[in-house]
A protein has these predicted regions:
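Short N-terminal "domain-start" leader segments
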Residues: 1-34
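Mixed-charge, Lys/Arg-enriched low-complexity segments
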Residues: 1-9, 34, 38-72
Length: 72
């Protein structure tokens, strides 16, 4: 899988687009980050509870895409 190009948005939020996936990481509070992955505009996976930082949220979102592509 190619490297994800994460784009910063307003605040401490990030988005990456890969094929037909949209990956998002958003800051929800001090040391609270939420991540989600959408495929074809439908929920694929998301985090609950929150992760500890943006980088970890990005890794979890990318793992979701890898798992989906491999059929895991």
């Amino acid at each position: 899988m190619e490297k994800m190009n994460w784009t910063p948005e307003s605040g401490d939020n990030f988005t990456a687009i890969y094929k037909n996936y949209i990956l998002r990481v958003e800051r929800m509070g001090p040391q609270k980050w939420w991540w989600a992955v959408y495929k074809d505009n439908e929920d694929l996976c998301y985090d609950n509870p929150f992760t500890r930082n943006a980088e970890y949220g990005k890794k979890l979102a990318e793992q979701c895409v890898r798992d989906d592509e491999s059929g895991s």
